[in-house]
Amino acid sequence: MKTKTHRTPTRSDRSIVQLVAHCACILAIVSITSRGVLEAADDQKQSELEASYFSPPIQVTQGLTKAGEGYFSPDSTRICYQGVPQGYPFYQIFTQPFDMQSPQPTSAQRISPGRGRTTCSYFSPDNQKLLFASSHLDPNMQQTEDAAINQAKEDAQSGRRRRYQWDFDPYSDIFAFDFDSKSLTRLTNAPGYDAECSFSADGKTIVFVSDRDGDPDIFLMNADGSGVRQLTNVPGYDGGPFFSPNGKWITFRSDRIEKDMLHIHVMRSDGEGDQALTDGKSVQWAPFWHPTKPWMIWTGADHSDPEKRPNYDLYLMRYSVDGDNFIPGPTIRMTDHPGADVLPVFSPDGNHLMWTASRSSDRVSQLWFSTINLDALELSLNRAAALSLPQQQ
């Protein structure tokens, strides 16, 4: 485990991190209508690039002010996600039935208690539990809610649209909801922010983020909340961790290379072998593993030109592993439409993709689903690899 100088991060330290820690760069927030699946806006139609990689995206959530950060259940019969209910200022956690053969919005069931900020839901591998982070035990909940509601009213009157920002809520803890007993078990109870949690493939270990040591770092704990151990200990934000399918690696995002410039990292599941996979004046975040292929997908945007608005798109990397060495390979861009495409996840069979976007005509952030063309992606990765080879003289 690496060491660092202890510090307490400030709001300015976290300006970009707060922007993208969960559902960043989502476009305008307006109430969704009661219509069926919304039509894609004219400027959001699928491009030639996108059409070569995946089927026309289908919106699979509606009825909430906005929704995002979705994940499939292990058997692909449900999805979980966070959404903002009508008339309430904070995200709550929902699940809904899902038909892979006929994807469409269905009736959502709220799983979280209904108050406070909630985020980062994730199914257990045995499909019996749902992890999520929640601040519903905030002792000042009424004041917290009132402040957010009053701010929303002021913004509505003035027409102001605030940049998306997620607070590192000091009352956020990790909970596990049991689908059979309908009980909620608290797994963390340390001062500060605990969130951004997911299971290992065997269901025995949870990887999560906590700022209990002064800034957000990555930790492990047993599935029952015991045996907490720290993996990263370097100044800056480390977050959004996920185990590889074989449990030997963890990918995450970090701004330790340069303040506010998030990049994709990978390390072994014991915290050793930490390395950055991306670099430069860009924000790269929300990495997620393909379940069967040596691929990793994430969201990225160029931030090198301060006069240019960054556009977040999806990128796919092929990697290889040689013993304890993780070797990044060619990377291709998968989306190129004008809005933000963020938080991509593969289905358990690896044939489908779900992500957060604002592709409907009303520009509300929702979850979208597509079937991916594995052969086309493999071919493009092969071409990218060939172009990166040294040219013979």
Q: Predicted segment positions?
A:
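N-terminal secretory signal peptides that target proteins for export/translocation
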Residues: 1-17
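Intrinsic disorder/low-complexity segments enriched in polar/small residues
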Residues: 3-5, 19, 40, 392-393
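Intrinsically disordered, low-complexity segments enriched in glycine/proline and serine/threonine
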Residues: 5-7, 21, 369
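Residue-level detector of bioactive/disordered segments in secreted/extracellular proteins
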Residues: 14, 25-27, 152-156
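Low-complexity, intrinsically disordered segments with a bias for serine/threonine
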Residues: 16-19, 204
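Bacterial N-terminal signal peptides
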Residues: 20-35
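Sequence signature of WD/YWTD-type beta-propeller architectures
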Residues: 38-393
